[in-house]
Amino acid sequence: MTLSRWQAQGNVYLVAEESLTAGAVRAQVGDADGILEVRGRGRDWIEIAIWNTDGSLAEMSGNGTRIAARWLAEQTGAEIITVRVGPREVVARMLGGPFVEQELAYEVGEPGIAAGFRYTPVDVGNPHAVVDANPAEIREIGPALETHARFPNRTNVQVARRLDDKTIEARVWERGVGETESSGTSAIAVAAAFGASDVKIRFPGGDLHVRLDGERAYLTGTAEVAASSGGSSP
């Protein structure tokens, strides 16, 4: 199996054009944060499945869809690409160089308390629980909320604090993966939970820009080739 290695703000995904199984994913993923399985494509559209490191499937990934769009754009030259993940679609616009803007829908729920932590739920095609606290607490708060009974299908967790009017610092605990360097849908979730309509989300892996307009979010970040790896499924 030949895999190309991409990264988006430190979030690493492998891209595979072959059909995968959970076992193959666990065997091949290595130190990446997941694998993007290409299930179909045209000049300006691509359909993918997003595999987590534990062999489970994710409903959505902002960084993953951005990588998929750039991967296709490098081959076809398309400047606007629709990325399909299950029933959802993300429109991605190439901005020049490694920069890509994506448009995604989001919805903020009612705040709650779980495992002693107050959180704001946000749906960005996948579930998020945003906690306003010191991001250094992610390894305590993340696993406590991810598997809490309040979230029967588990949840992604963000621990964030506002640095100024235009900057929020955050760390991410992704369900089925653990802590990651950044997350695109997490950036949207954090901005939405904080009510910040035009803001930079600062992750350990780099910054993402989020602009909210009604129920739509516009996420801008990079996607770049990291390296290549090869192997074969068991």
Located regions from the model:
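Extended Gly/Ser/Thr-rich low-complexity repeat segments
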Residues: 111-120, 228-234
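Active-site glycine-rich loop that binds ribose-phosphate moieties when present
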Residues: 105-118, 138-143
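A glycine-rich beta-to-alpha transition motif near the start of alpha/beta enzyme domains, typified by
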Residues: 1-98, 130-234
